[in-house]
Amino acid sequence: MIIFRRCVFINHRDFQVNEQIRDKEVRLIDQDGKQIGIMSAKEAYKIAQERHLDLVKIVPNANPPVCKLMDFGKYRYELSKREKEAKKKQKIINVKEIRMSPNIEDHDFGVKLKSAIKFLKDGDKVKVTIRFRGREAAHTSLAEDLLKRFAEELREYGNVEKAPSMDGRNMMMVIAPKKQ
C-alpha cells in the first residue's frame, strides 16, 4: 500500500490540514460540496488518502468542526490568485507635491498647473506648497490669493480637500481628484 504524505506549509490563515486535525469528530464534506456525514477525524483522513486529496478544516468553530476534502495546494494557489486580483483592483492614492514661491512668474505657474492636472488625471492628490523665504512671510495674503487662483484653475479636475493654511514657513493646500 502506498501512503501519500504531502509536505504542507500553513499559510497566514492557519489552516489545519491532514494529521494536524486533532479533533475526535468532524463533519466531512467532499470536493463537490456534498455532506458525507459526521465521523472520526481518522476515518475522514483515511477517506482523503484513498481519494488522493487533503483533509482541510474549514470551519474550526463549529461543533463538530467542518472539514472538506480538497487539493490543498490548488486551493492555496486559488486563494493567493484572488488576493492578487483584489490588490490590483485597489487604487493606491499618492500625494504629489508641487512647490512654488509667492512671487512665481506666469509661465512657471502654467507649468506647475499642467503637472497638477496630470497628477489629478492619474488619480493622485496634489499638495500645493508655497515656501516663504526671509521677509516674504509678511505677505501671506499674496500666497493665499495665488493658491485660490491655482484651485480655481483646477476646478474641473479636482476639489479642494484642505483649504490654504500656514504650516511653519509654508502655506499649503491639498486638492483631491474628482470622482469619475
From Swiss-Prot:
Localization, per the record, is: Cytoplasm
What's an example of a GO molecular-function annotation for this chain?
Answer: ribosome binding
Pfam families reported for this sequence: IF3_C (PF00707), IF3_N (PF05198)
Its quaternary structure? Answer: Monomer.
| PANTHER family according to UniProt | TRANSLATION INITIATION FACTOR IF-3, TRANSLATION INITIATION FACTOR IF-3, MITOCHONDRIAL
State its role: IF-3 binds to the 30S ribosomal subunit and shifts the equilibrium between 70S ribosomes and their 50S and 30S subunits in favor of the free subunits, thus enhancing the availability of 30S subunits on which protein synthesis initiation begins.
Family membership, please give it: Belongs to the IF-3 family.
Family matches, as NCBIfam families: infC
| Protein known as | Translation initiation factor IF-3
